[in-house]
Amino acid sequence: MDDKRALLRHTVATVAYRGGKAVRGAPASFAGYSPDGSPRTAGKILAHVGDLLDWALSQAKGAEAWTDSPPLQWDLEVERFFGALQRFDDYLASDAPLAVSVERIFQGAVADALTHIGQLAMLRRLAGAKMKGENYSRADIAVGRVGLEQTSAKREFD
């Protein structure tokens, strides 16, 4: 595996780690939360992240396709998010060629997913379900670990 593809896999694992932190322990009611009453709720944002990951996989396979999925019930949307991460990482881990460049996948879908994970973390605080901050440079993020179960935080703070 070349260095660029390996770095993309590490980034996908980072999305899983940070995304896991953003969704873990969130109440089911968080799915419908929007600070200003707009239709862009936490559940719709997470559904969009799942769509981004599906899009990244379709780009990698050379059959680029976009889906605008309606949000599922919160726990099902969380499962969908991690399932999409797993499918994308499995493809990246394989010997299958990438139909587009690593840079294109990163600058679009993956970077956008990271942005939206940050939005979910901010919405948690606004919704009164805040999560602790963390020094992510010390986090035990490992290539291939893309499920909900992640290692415990090494250095958290309020």
Question: Can you name each region flagged by the protein language model?
Answer:
Residues 1-2:
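N-terminal export signals and maturation junctions of secreted/periplasmic proteins
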Residues 5, 9-23, 30-68, 100-158:
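Short, contiguous alpha-helical
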Residues 55-96:
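Helix-adjacent hinge/juxtasegments
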Residues 20, 24, 86-89:
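Amphipathic, well-packed alpha-helical segments that form the structural scaffold of globular domains
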Residues 26, 94-99:
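Short, solvent-exposed, charged loop/turn and helix-capping segments
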